[in-house]
Amino acid sequence: MKTLYSLRRFYPVETLFNGTLALAGRDQETTGFAWWAGNARLINLSGKLLGAHVAHAGLIVFWAGAMNLFEVAHFVPEKPMYEQGLILLPHLATLGWGVGPGGEVIDTFPYFVSGVLHLISSAVLGFGGIYHALLGPETLEESFPFFGYVWKDRNKMTTILGIHLILLGIGAFLLVLKALYFGGVYDTWAPGGGDVRKITNLTLSPSVIFGYLLKSPFGGEGWIVSVDDLEDIIGGHIWLGSICILGGIWHILTKPFAWARRAFVWSGEAYLSYSLAALSVFGFIACCFVWFNNTAYPSEFYGPTGPEASQAQAFTFLVRDQRLGANVGSAQGPTGLGKYLMRSPTGEVIFGGETMRFWDLRAPWLEPLRGPNGLDLSRLKKDIQPWQERRSAEYMTHAPLGSLNSVGGVATEINAVNYVSPRSWLATSHFVLGFFLFVGHLWHAGRARAAAAGFEKGIDRDFEPVLSMTPLN
């Protein structure tokens, strides 16, 4: 393989902490990286780098399978998923596997199958990773030119990008196929408290789908996170899958335009930084989605959202006091506003008390009680169903709060109850991971730009300000 540039120019020399440890073709002298820099030693060894990536995929899939089986082994069907600290089974249940009306788990066998399939896949990936890391060719360019590459080869890089986009598009269409033809998905909005159904009347209108992208991200609007029906979600996946596949074909067939060649840095570390930036954005979006959205992440499996738990508490006490004879339409609270019901600034009838800040919550157990002007007093008096009372009481005591005391007027459990909502876990973990991926993006982007500009060795030490300062001692 012809290396198009010197290693020294693009890869800074790191300090070797252990000079005696040397592996043929993997030591500091031949790669410019010390042993602790991991896969950086394999930057120009496409075969070995393939092994590292396949092995990494094996670890990821092994975790998924093992954790899946762990959750199945610990699962208690009588308790809601969100009380059991589960993060994988809720995803499988949302896809419509093993659940029936109201989100009740009727069969755990599909979950077991999922775990076993992932374990078997991880074994295949693990074997492939070890093979390519230890036995396979060091570089792929000579033997398998289709899979070989040089980082500076812009045409090859966009071809690889295109292949990735096509795979992502196929992934989006797998959800579409599940929703349309293979048993459907769980719809929390199905009448009577949620059910699995096939999605038939897809939303394909570009004005609706792309309207989400044009919405404000702030309260009441909520950008794409505000999606609240499965027709839009599955229709969006058709659009997204189509765009990804067409974009992938485009990137395979074309070469980068001159402006793109000039605008981007074309090196392995630059591509790493772009990928980290993309993953960071995904992490932040996922954080907001799992925290606020109860359609893509049904509350039956993930527990209520924060606003939902707060509104559920107001609803629960409205039901109780109405039964005890309170006139919920006119009772005054301690602030002079309505105790149970009040009007929002725009005139809708909303729940009173601290939960007024969450007045724009939409939830399947509450929407049937709304009329054209917000909550309908006559429906609140005559139409409340037992399942709505049960669900709101359950949600009231399972707020996604990690606090020791009450927050936002929501009753939290007594200290003897060890409850952390999966929404809290998933939102927090994705925010933190998104943040660190963003820091990694800044770090690798800075190094890649410096290497491309030819000054990755750092600033000239002769002119450092500290040299002209008085020593500390």
Curated annotation (Swiss-Prot):
Q: Where in the cell is it found?
A: Plastid, Chloroplast thylakoid membrane
| Origin: domain of life | Eukaryota
**Family per record:** Belongs to the PsbB/PsbC family. PsbC subfamily.
Q: What's a GO biological-process term for it?
A: photosynthetic electron transport in photosystem II
Q: Does the keyword Kinase apply?
A: no
The cofactor note reads: Binds multiple chlorophylls and provides some of the ligands for the Ca-4Mn-5O cluster of the oxygen-evolving complex. It may also provide a ligand for a Cl- that is required for oxygen evolution. PSII binds additional chlorophylls, carotenoids and specific lipids.
Which residues get removed as pro-piece?
A: 1-14
Q: Which GO terms describe its cellular component?
A: chloroplast thylakoid membrane; photosystem II
Oligomer status and interactors: PSII is composed of 1 copy each of membrane proteins PsbA, PsbB, PsbC, PsbD, PsbE, PsbF, PsbH, PsbI, PsbJ, PsbK, PsbL, PsbM, PsbT, PsbX, PsbY, PsbZ, Psb30/Ycf12, at least 3 peripheral proteins of the oxygen-evolving complex and a large number of cofactors. It forms dimeric complexes.
Q: Which residues carry this modification: Phosphothreonine?
A: 15
Would you tell me the protein name for this molecule?
Photosystem II CP43 reaction center protein
So where does this one cross the membrane? Answer: 69-93, 134-155, 178-200, 255-275, 291-312, 447-471
Q: Which residues carry this modification: N-acetylthreonine?
A: 15
Instruction: Provide a Gene Ontology MF annotation, just one.
Output: metal ion binding
**Pfam families, per database record:** PSII
Which keywords does this chain's UniProt record carry? Acetylation, Chlorophyll, Chloroplast, Chromophore, Manganese, Membrane, Metal-binding, Phosphoprotein, Photosynthesis, Photosystem II, Plastid, Thylakoid, Transmembrane, Transmembrane helix
Q: Residues that bind [CaMn4O5] cluster, according to the entry?
A: 367
Q: What biological function has been recorded for the protein in this entry? A: One of the components of the core complex of photosystem II (PSII). It binds chlorophyll and helps catalyze the primary light-induced photochemical processes of PSII. PSII is a light-driven water:plastoquinone oxidoreductase, using light energy to abstract electrons from H(2)O, generating O(2) and a proton gradient subsequently used for ATP formation.
Listed HAMAP family: PSII_PsbC_CP43
Chief place where the protein resides: plastid
InterPro entries per UniProt:
PS_antenna-like (IPR000932), PS_II_antenna-like_sf (IPR036001), PSII_PsbC (IPR005869), PSII_PsbC_sf (IPR044900)
Q: How does it sit in the membrane?
A: Multi-pass membrane protein
